């Protein structure tokens, strides 16, 4: 301790000598203001190195009275060691311990705040706070080199001034700074201003808790997030984390973002929703010191593959949500217990998922795609469906062909129908087809075997759709037939007055939509077998009806329907018909508007449907009110084929054109040509779509690459 005091005293001597020397006038001071300014400087030095009264008592004689003049420091210069020993050293000894551990006075055992030992400091001065600014290595290196150019005595003086300021409490620091700033000239003040502008910046993301940092980053768009990741390694870990990009995927994938207007192609929404809880928990336990994969999300600690599915997006994107979920459900039981390599290689970070979807979405927007043509049928292609790398097509040549979409190779041909095939649908295990020979056939499409044949219609089958255990078929005989695979029951839905061209089953609400040549669309209740609602508006035969996913959102102020030219009728009450005709909204719940057969516990049918007709138009409807929200104009002839999801509508018509529409604005985004005959069928996926035509060809447009 004695050596420390000795070094402090030596530093004090040199620093006082330095200060006195710096304050020496370079010439005779004649102006009163200059004399007054120098007198203030002397008083400030005396306040640091000792009171004027103590010094005066020792040297205040008649002979040396001239030393009290502003331009003379002779007396002060003769006793630097005494003044430093008396004032500077005690100042440092008193304040330095309190600067780094303010637990009370050194002479007492009283603790001021055990829970927060640095409670005396603001958030910028607390030594234990993470946001305390680190030293700037280039600046400090430059400062060191400039300091070394000065004489040793000047170096010690400057260093001791720094020590005094560093040891001073906050109140003292403000006084010192105010005194220094008062003596600075304009160039010096300009230098201070430029320097402070950079010094007052803090790394707020590092200082805040991780969950708050993630909350801030979730407000940024993708461009800003990518720029934030370039700031530092810490920012990169935060900006690239699954917590942020899961939210970005949730906001954009399979829906239009209300902020930026962007929507990205389909993703398994079920997994996206299920993983939300895991992501929220992860945000509160995030640690940058963890493994590098923590930010990217390649590592998982879930004990079972089910948990992995809820956390990570499967590496190989697919085109249909339902089929993917079914495939995983059927294969999880036989899947071995996964290890860490399984997670790392099979599941990607959400940022990679978003990047892949964004690339596909951009290709959709600008029409960048590759085209593949499938030739093999000898008559017009009337129906098709694709899933992963499998494409099934049905034709008026009475055959069904199975294709490999990657190679374009024809895998097999299914033969058995006696007339043209108008409709088909397949899943992992079976393919069901409907033909003008009045029959439906169930096939094992992997082997080509016909498993069973169903007859029940008195006319050709021109439309079918199955969901879970319910199959609906539409026929030339003006009826819709419901087949229940579970209890083997069947029944007919009668009401249309002309051919029924298309049907769609919604097992969630236990309802069926049907489109007919009588220019109407009907909504049926499978429980009561009653028609809940009839949609009028088309002036041509309605060829297709497609319910939109429940995630689809439409702003009412965007509606531009002409209610004078459309109407809807309900199978229950006239009041509902009048209300829907006028476009008024009911005060009842969404389910009750469909009649007493719907109780509060029964899910409502899909809220929006899209229809196409031979009047060359496409219409968007709201099922709860029966309103036509939008009419799409652009095709020159009747629209035969239709596909839709939450982001777009794809239509094919007699005019041999395929058009892509924005369902919210009604704008035609792009038109594709290439077929030499009417476009009769369309299949739509997340990154591609396929069209079939009476020219016997199938064309597939891929936006993936």
Curated annotation (Swiss-Prot):
Residue ranges of every copy of the F-box domain listed in the record: 202-248
Functional pathway: Protein modification; protein ubiquitination
Residue ranges of WD repeats: 376-413, 416-455, 457-493, 495-536, 588-631, 634-671, 674-705
Alphabetized CDD domains for the sequence: F-box_SpPof1-like, WD40
Record's keyword annotation contains Transcription regulation: yes
Gene3D superfamilies attached to this UniProt entry: 1.20.1280.50, YVTN repeat-like/Quinoprotein amine dehydrogenase
GO biological process, one term: protein ubiquitination
Superkingdom per UniProt: Eukaryota
Assembly notes: Component of the SCF(sconB) E3 ubiquitin ligase complex.
Protein name per Swiss-Prot or TrEMBL: Probable E3 ubiquitin ligase complex SCF subunit sconB
